[in-house]
C-alpha cells in the first residue's frame, strides 16, 4: 500500500457564518483525520477544511475540484437549498467520474437539499419537499420533541449520546473493526432528527450498509448507503446526517448554534468503546474513499469468522485436552 498522504477536502455548503454549522464545528473529526499516520509515521491524510464562498456564484474550490489534487471530498450539506452552484455540481460530478471519492451528508427535512442537484450520490438523499422517499410509509413524522421539524426526522437519541447500529448484508469495509466484539463497528453518534437515505433502484453499485432504530417509534431507518467504485465513478457514501461527524455530537461541551435547543446527552463521553467505534468509522471511510480498502482489517475479520466457524464445528461432546503429567 502506498504511503503517500490521502488529500481530503472537508467542505460545507454555507459561508463562514458563526452561528451556524460552519466547518469549525467539525474540528474534532478534522483534527483526528490529520493526526492519523502510516506505519512509517508519515501523515495518512492531508486535510483541508473550509466553508463555501458566497452563494449564488461558483465556489472557487468546488467548481474546479476535478482539476485539483484532492483524492476525496466530504461534503457537509448544511444549507437550506442554495448551497451548490450548477458549476459546483458539474465539477463534483467530473471529480467522481475521474475516480475521486465522495461522501455526501445532510440532516433532517430539507436541510441540505442542494445535494439533489448533484445526481449520483445526491439521488440517495430523500427530503421533505424534493426527491422524497419513494416508500410512502416512510413519509411520516418520527421525532416529536421538535415540532417544527417534519419528516424525515428519525430520532436515534440525544445529541451527545450514541446509537447501536445494525450492519446490513455482507459487512462493508468501512464497518470493519478488528478490535470490536464480532469484528464490526457497532456505534455511531445519535441525533434527535436524522435525515433519510436509500439506494437508488437503478444503480447497481449502491446498497444500504447500515441501519439505525428510532427510539421514539422503533422504526428502522437507513444510516449509510455505499456506492462501489466502477467504470462510471469512484467510491461514494451517502450518510443520513452530518451530526455523525459534528463536534457537538462527539462532545456537547464544544457548543452548537443558538437555534439548537434540545437537551444533549452525555453517554458518548462516558463510553470509550463507542468513541473508538466512531473514530474507526471515520478512519475506514477516509481509506476506502481513497481506494485504500482496509485489506488487513478485512483479513482479520475473515480470520475471526473462520475461527468461530471452526469452533462451532467441533462436537460438543469432545473432552477438553488434559495435561496428564
What are these regions (language model features)?
Residues 107, 240-241, 325:
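Short, well-ordered beta-to-alpha junction loops that form the rim of enzyme active sites
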Residues 104-218:
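An acidic, glycine-rich "communication" segment
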Residues 6-121:
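Helical hinge/lid and interdomain linker segments adjacent to catalytic or ligand-binding clefts
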Residues 1-31, 69-74, 112-114, 120, ...:
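Extracellular ligand-binding/catalytic regions of CAZymes and related secreted enzymes
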Residues 297-325:
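Intrinsic, low-complexity terminal and presequence regions
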Residues 37-41, 197-203, 230:
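Short, conserved catalytic or adaptor-binding loops enriched in Gly and charged residues
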Residues 97, 290-291, 315:
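Residues at helix-coil transition
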Amino acid at each position: 500500500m502506498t504511503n503517500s498522504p490521502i488529500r481530503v477536502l472537508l467542505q460545507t455548503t454555507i459561508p463562514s457564518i458563526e452561528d451556524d454549522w460552519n466547518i469549525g464545528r467539525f474540528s474534532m473529526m478534522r483534527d483526528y483525520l490529520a493526526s492519523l499516520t502510516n506505519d512509517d509515521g508519515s501523515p495518512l491524510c492531508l486535510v483541508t477544511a473550509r466553508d463555501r464562498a458566497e452563494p449564488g456564484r461558483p465556489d472557487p474550490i468546488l467548481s474546479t475540484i476535478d482539476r485539483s489534487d484532492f483524492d476525496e471530498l466530504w461534503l457537509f450539506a448544511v444549507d437550506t437549498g442554495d448551497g451548490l452552484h450548477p458549476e459546483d455540481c458539474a465539477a463534483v460530478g467530473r471529480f467522481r467520474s475521474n475516480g475521486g471519492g465522495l461522501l455526501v451528508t445532510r440532516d433532517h427535512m430539507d436541510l441540505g437539499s442542494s445535494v439533489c442537484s448533484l445526481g449520483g450520490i445526491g439521488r440517495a438523499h430523500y427530503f421533505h419537499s424534493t426527491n422524497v422517499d419513494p416508500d410512502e410509509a416512510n413519509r411520516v413524522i418520527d421525532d416529536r420533541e421538535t415540532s417544527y421539524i417534519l419528516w424525515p426526522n428519525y430520532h436515534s437519541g440525544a445529541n451527545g449520546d450514541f446509537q447501536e447500529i445494525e450492519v446490513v448484508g455482507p459487512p462493508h469495509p468501512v464497518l470493519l473493526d478488528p478490535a470490536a466484539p464480532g469484528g464490526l463497528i457497532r456505534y455511531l453518534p445519535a441525533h434527535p432528527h436524522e435525515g433519510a437515505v436509500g439506494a437508488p433502484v437503478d444503480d447497481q453499485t449502491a446498497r444500504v450498509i447500515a441501519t439505525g432504530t428510532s427510539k421514539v417509534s422503533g422504526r428502522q431507518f437507513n444510516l449509510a448507503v455505499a456506492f462501489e467504485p466502477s467504470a462510471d465513478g469512484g467510491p461514494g457514501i451517502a450518510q443520513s446526517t452530518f451530526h455523525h461527524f459534528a463536534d457537538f455530537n462527539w462532545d456537547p461541551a464544544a457548543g452548537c448554534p443558538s437555534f439548537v435547543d434540545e437537551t444533549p446527552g452525555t453517554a458518548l463521553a462516558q463510553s470509550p468503546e463507542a468513541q473508538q467505534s466512531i473514530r474507526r468509522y471515520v478512519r475506514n471511510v477516509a481509506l476506502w474513499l481513497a481506494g485504500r480498502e482496509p485489506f488487513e482489517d478485512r483479513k482479520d475479520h475473515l480470520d475471526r469468522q473462520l475461527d468461530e466457524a471452526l469452533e462451532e464445528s467441533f462436537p460438543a461432546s469432545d473432552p477438553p485436552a488434559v495435561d496428564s503429567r
